[in-house]
Amino acid sequence: MTEAALVEGQVKLRDGKKWKSRWLVLRKPSPVADCLLMLVYKDKCERSKGLRERSSLTLEDICGLEPALPYEGLAHTLAIICLSQAVMLGFDSHEAMCAWDTRIRYALGEVHRFHVTVAPGTKLESGPATLHLCNDILVLARDIPPTVMGQWKLSDLRRYGAVPNGFIFEGGTRCGYWAGVFFLSSAEGEQMSFLFDCIVRGISPTKGPFGLRPVLPDPSSGGPSASEERVAQEALEALQLEKRLSLLSHSGRPGSGGDDRSLSSSSSEASHSDISASSRLTAWPEQSSSSAGTSQEGPGLVAAQGPGEAMLGASRPPLKPLRPRQLQEVGRQSSSDSGIATGSHSSYSGSFSSYAGSNLDVWRAGEEFGSLLSLPPGASAPEPRLCACPPGAAEYQVPTSLRHHYDTPRSLRQAPRDPSPASQGSSDHGSATDLGGQAPTGCPSSWLGARRRGQATEGPGSDAALPSPSPGESWEAGSPHAGPPPAFFLSCSICGGLKVKPPP
C-alpha cells in the first residue's frame, strides 16, 4: 500500500442494523487502477500507529456516486455504486459528505448523474430512475440503496442524441440483453448529448489543464462548530502573517539606513584617500605660499651652488609670484575640495597631452591652464644653471649628426636680440616681455635664458633652434618630428653649467 490516500476520515458504516463509527481510508491500488481499496480502522490512533486495518474491501466496476440519500435514520449519506453492489457511507455533516463526494469524483475521473424518467415500452421498468455516467460506463439505477437496472458501454451504442423533452439511445448487438432503443424523459437532454460526445472523443470536460489540480475541500471538517473553528484559525493565521510583515518592514528600515551610511562613509574615505594621493602627486601653487616658498628655498639653493652660480643668480631678475589656477572659470572646483583631487591630477595630464602638436604660439597665452609653462618647478630638483665661463674658453666640440630644423613662429623671429653680454640682464627682461606681453605664469628662468642663448646663435633667415627643457621637466611635444628631442645644450667641463651647442 504505497499509494497515498485519496481521502480518509471519520465515517459511519452500516453493520447489520446499526451504524458504527470507523476511521475509513480510500486509496487506489495503482495510479491507473479503475477501482478503489477501502481500509477500515477502529479509530485514528490505529491508523497513526501503523496497525493493521480491521477490514478491507475492493470496489470494482464503479459506475457512479449518489449523495444525500436518507437511509436508516441518516440524512447525510453517500452511496458508491458498483455493478454488483453499493456501499453506503454516513456522515455527521453535509460539508463532510460533499468533501468526500468531490474527492472521490476527482479520483475516478468523469463521474456524472442525471435524474430521468424511463418511458414505457422497453425492457426497463418504467418510472423514475437515475442515469449514472462514469467514464465509458452508462447505468440506470433506482431504489435505496441504489441497484443497477441496466448497463451499457458507450462504445457499444449505435446512436444517441437529444430529442424534445428527453434523450434517446440505441444499444447494438454487443449490448446483449440491453440491446434496443431506450427513451429517457428529462429536461437535460442537450447536456447529456454533449457529455456523450466529449467522452467518446476522449475529452474530459470537467478536468482542467494538465498539471493543474483544483482546490479540493477538506473532509475532516464537520458540523457548525468545526466551521467556526476553521474560520477562527484562518483569522488567527492572517493576524500572525500581518504581524510578521510589520516586523519585517520595521526591521528592514534601519538596515537599509545603515547600508546607506556605510556606503557614504566608504565614499568619503575614498575621497579622502584620493585627496591624499593627489597631494603627493601634484603641487598646485597658491598665492599666499608662493612668496614664502621662494624665501625659504633661497638660502638652501645658494648654499648648494658654487660662487659662479651665486653670481649668476644675483644678476638674474627675480621671479614673478605665481598666480593661482582659476579652475572655477572653466567649471571645475578648487583642488582643495573633496572629490576633485584625483580629477584635477587627471585633468593636468590630459591638458598636457592636448597641447601636443601645437606650435610655440601657445606660450603667448599666459592664462592657459594645464600647459607645461604654467607648472611650477620641482621643489626637490635644483634649477639648471647656465655656463658662466667667458666665450673664448670653449673647447673643441665633437661633430654629431645633422642638426634638425624646425619651423619657428614669426613672433620669435621678430623678437629683438641684443648680442652684447653687458646688457644681458636687460635683454632678458625685454625678450620675456616681448614673447607674450608678460612672462608666462610659472615659466622657469632657465627656459627664458636658454631661449635667448639659442636666438643669439642663429642668423637672420635661418631656423631657430628650440630650447630643450630642463632635466626636472618634461619635453613639450610641439614639433612635428617624433622621437627624442635633439641635444641643443652641452655641459661645460669647467663649471658644469649648460651652454648652447654650436652648429656643426
Swiss-Prot record:
Ranges annotated as biased composition (Low complexity): 263-280
Predominant place of localization: membrane
Annotated ranges, domain IRS-type PTB: 105-210
UniProt GO MF annotations: phosphatidylinositol binding; protein kinase binding; signaling adaptor activity
KO phenotype (gene knockout): Mice are immobile at birth and die shortly thereafter. They do not form neither acetylcholine receptor clusters nor neuromuscular synapses.
Source organism superkingdom: Eukaryota
Ranges annotated as biased composition (Polar residues): 285-297, 331-341, 421-430
Regions annotated as coiled coil: none
Membrane protein topology class: Peripheral membrane protein
Record region (Disordered): 210-232, 248-348, 371-483
Keywords, sorted A to Z: Cell membrane, Lipid-binding, Membrane, Synapse
Pfam families, per the entry: IRS
Subcellular localization: Cell membrane; Synapse
GO biological process per UniProt: enzyme-linked receptor protein signaling pathway; neuromuscular junction development; positive regulation of protein tyrosine kinase activity; positive regulation of Rac protein signal transduction; positive regulation of skeletal muscle acetylcholine-gated channel clustering; receptor clustering
An annotated GO cellular component: postsynaptic membrane
Gene3D superfamilies from the UniProt entry: Pleckstrin-homology domain (PH domain)/Phosphotyrosine-binding domain (PTB)
Subunit (UniProt): Homodimer. Forms a heterotetramer composed of 2 DOK7 and 2 MUSK molecules which facilitates MUSK trans-autophosphorylation on tyrosine residue and activation. Interacts (via IRS-type PTB domain) with MUSK (via cytoplasmic part); requires MUSK phosphorylation.
Entry's free-text remark on domains: The PH domain mediated binding to phospholipids with phosphoinositol headgroups. Affinity is highest for phosphatidyl 3,4,5-trisphosphate, followed by phosphatidylinositol 3,4-bisphosphate and phosphatidylinositol 4,5-bisphosphate.
Function: Probable muscle-intrinsic activator of MUSK that plays an essential role in neuromuscular synaptogenesis. Acts in aneural activation of MUSK and subsequent acetylcholine receptor (AchR) clustering in myotubes. Induces autophosphorylation of MUSK.
Protein's name in the database: Protein Dok-7
Name of the gene encoding the protein in the UniProt record: Dok7
